[in-house]
């Protein structure tokens, strides 16, 4: 058994800053642990669910300002985490996110458009867990030292700065 894989978030980068901690789907639980560890000026936790069957709600409320979005609008903002940010007119200096690829793409675009430092944790299936098989590769702006192409091995590089 191998794990955990990849690199964690650097919580010290958020010190003295307003932070978004954003999670969706199976990316929600890792954001809770990050919220517990992080010391920053303002901690805004934005999590997305499909419906009212939310989980870890009380724990998130104890860790920071919680904003919820649901696809069906049954709890919080109707839509996704980006809809919640826009509806609540939230502002941040740094973003940490974990969740499905479409959510992470939207967060990356938002961060780039607004000049916000952004760190994402990518979700991919991992076969070997040591970077040899390249099953978990995704495209990246930076060249991977292993393959010398614009890819990241999620099992080895996991966290991405965008």
Residue ranges and their predicted role:
Residues 1-125:
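FNR/FR-type flavoprotein reductase catalytic core
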Residues 30, 101-102, 123-159:
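Local cysteine-cluster metal-coordination motifs and their immediate loop/turn environment
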